[in-house]
Amino acid sequence: MAQNFGKIPSHKSYVLSLYRTVLRNIPKCCHSYAFQYEIKKTLSKQLFKHKHDKSSWSVYTLLNEFSLLNNCLLEGKLQEIKNLMKPLKKMKKQLETTKILNSLTSLGDVKTNDPEEVRRFHVLSAYIKRKQDLGLLPAYIPKTYQHKLLLPLALNEHACLKLFHIQQKLKNGPPSAGLSYTKEGRNQIWFVRSPINKGRQQSKKLGILIRKERKDSQKNIDNLNFCEINAAWALHEAIWEEYLESKKIIKVNLPKYLEYAANIPKSTKCNPSSQYQKIKEWVDPVREIMFELHSKSFQRVEYFNKYKEKLLKNGGQLAYFDKKSKEMYAKRLTLFRKMSKETLPYVTLFIEGRDLPSVLAKYGF
């Protein structure tokens, strides 16, 4: 069975040696940085492309050209090097041109539309389908009628539904800001949720904090799991050494011994509670590390509980966003009343600029 030349040690050694020699000779014999880069790039591509060649004639031809390139460099024949590289460039350009032509052919007559036009088209399509399902429109409708007659009706119906939702929201009264949280490990990260700071308006720092806490919590859990595994091995070592010295087998409830209580004093947490010296030597160092990890976790819990109190304080973020939400509601209510009084009675479906979608856009709805 034919074998790749790259797997033959003598061939691999020869190619790498020649490649290193050429790379050393390029800056010595060629003073143009652009041409140096071009030669190196072409060499790298060709070596990667023909890495798995099995044809002996192809490999032989390429090695001859490689050796000729090195000789041309040493003799300063840069024009001959360009001639050697021309077929490779030509092939690349042809391939790129073919790809472009194929992509253009596949595109056909498809045109890129404006996003607003696409939105209007979807509204019209949904309107026609709905009316056809109810038997209010025929199966075939000419394009002229669709755009000149049905499109204004479809947009008006869509805008009426939007207007109804706006009216209902304003009728429900001013929205209030509230506290929400996301849980990461033991931590509850509290933050203010309101109409002002939802979606893209949400604080980027909050997102960074949540991702950081998620990463740190997972790291803490992984470290505790690793310590539990090491504690089990340490207990086996302690039992074995105690048996060798006193011929006694230690009986220890390891999960209970490693159990951490958040409400006991620090001195009690970290002091060894075992009467066996070998347990103190082997298991207690791991136990102390686990207690430190637990302590760090509970400190973060306390920190976020205090942060919640800070958010709830008078003049804090909750009060600020609540005030801003009410101001936004009052502004929208004023605009809605103004629009209802001055513009809505004079809406005309088929006059652009005086139709309902244009009126809603004008007043920021």
Swiss-Prot record:
N-glycosylated. Glycosylation is important for correct localization of the protein. Keywords: Glycoprotein, Mitochondrion. It is found in: Mitochondrion. GO terms for cellular component: mitochondrion. Essential for respiratory growth and required for mitochondrial protein synthesis. Required for vacuolar acidification. Belongs to the RRG1 family. This is Required for respiratory growth protein 1, mitochondrial.
